[in-house]
Amino acid sequence: MNWSVFEGLLSGVNKYSTAFGRIWLSLVFVFRVLVYLVTAERVWGDDQKDFDCNTRQPGCTNVCYDEFFPVSHVRLWALQLILVTCPSLLVVMHVAYRKAREKKYQEKIGEGYLYPNPGKKRGGLWWTYVFSLSFKATIDIIFLYLFHAFYPRYTLPSMVKCHAEPCPNTVDCFIAKPSEKNIFIVFMVVTAVICILLNLVELIYLVIKRCSECAQLRRPPTAHAKNDPNWANSPSKEKDFLSCDLIFLGSDAHPPLLPDRPRAHVKKTIL
């Protein structure tokens, strides 16, 4: 694996994320991915070999293991982490697409721009980011449900009773390292729940922020705002211009009417 490429992808994801997104990224790659790579394979490496039943009936141990472990924890976690981390790369790819499109536009036109800031979450990029948050939270919720369906209460007992064929009768089977596995399972479940909460909080934050910005754009500017020197380049001025309000430089008063023309025929102009 080329770690420089991996580091570049992570830095790109971190660059275009909010504070909540950066916390989520650190939590996933430090407490989930690294812990999984270092610990999971060692704890579950020889799980089937260490699964022991008090019978010598050929095939009984394998059948009992398959009954109590239909899907390995390690493989479920691997699939979960892959599906959870991939949507974050969609944001980086969308920003790269915007930059490439902006570059082609500059080469063709030579002036102006398509995006004032290609990395700013506006338009399609905002929807891409919201989709990635929703997808990540949904994936974690689905996998938590699957784990609970396969292993109720997420914990493993030290001994299970099996009566599946070809076992001659009910046999006792013993799981290797149950306490160590339960600690690891609880850790992975708790970190997944925290990641879900972070995704939901970030999603709510983005929606509230976007609604607030839209409300500010629709709000008419006050006289104090129009007298502000920075108001000349603000969206409020553009809105006043589009609504055909007559604004004079340094004043919000209407001009005096010409004596020989009615007020309705005065051409409204912005200076």
Swiss-Prot record:
Entry annotated with the keyword Transmembrane helix: yes
Disulfide bond residue pairs: none
Superkingdom classification of source: Eukaryota
Extracellular side, ranges: 41-75, 148-183
Keywords: Cell junction, Cell membrane, Gap junction, Membrane, Transmembrane, Transmembrane helix
Chief site of localization: membrane
InterPro entries per UniProt: Connexin (IPR000500), Connexin311 (IPR002271), Connexin_CCC (IPR019570), Connexin_CS (IPR017990), Connexin_N (IPR013092), Connexin_N_sf (IPR038359)
Tissue: Expressed in skin, much lower in testis.
Protein localization: Cell membrane; Cell junction, Gap junction
Membrane-spanning segments: 21-40, 76-98, 125-147, 184-206
UniProt-listed GO biological process terms: cell communication; labyrinthine layer morphogenesis; spongiotrophoblast differentiation; trophoblast giant cell differentiation
Coiled-coil parts of chain: none
Membrane topology, as annotated: Multi-pass membrane protein
UniProt keyword Transmembrane helix present: yes
GO cellular component terms, A-Z: connexin complex
Sequence ranges on the Cytoplasmic membrane side: 1-20, 99-124, 207-271
Complex and partners: A connexon is composed of a hexamer of connexins.
Family of the protein in this entry: Belongs to the connexin family. Beta-type (group I) subfamily.
Biological role: One gap junction consists of a cluster of closely packed pairs of transmembrane channels, the connexons, through which materials of low MW diffuse from one cell to a neighboring cell.
Protein name, per record: Gap junction beta-5 protein
Species the sequence originates in: Mus musculus (Mouse)
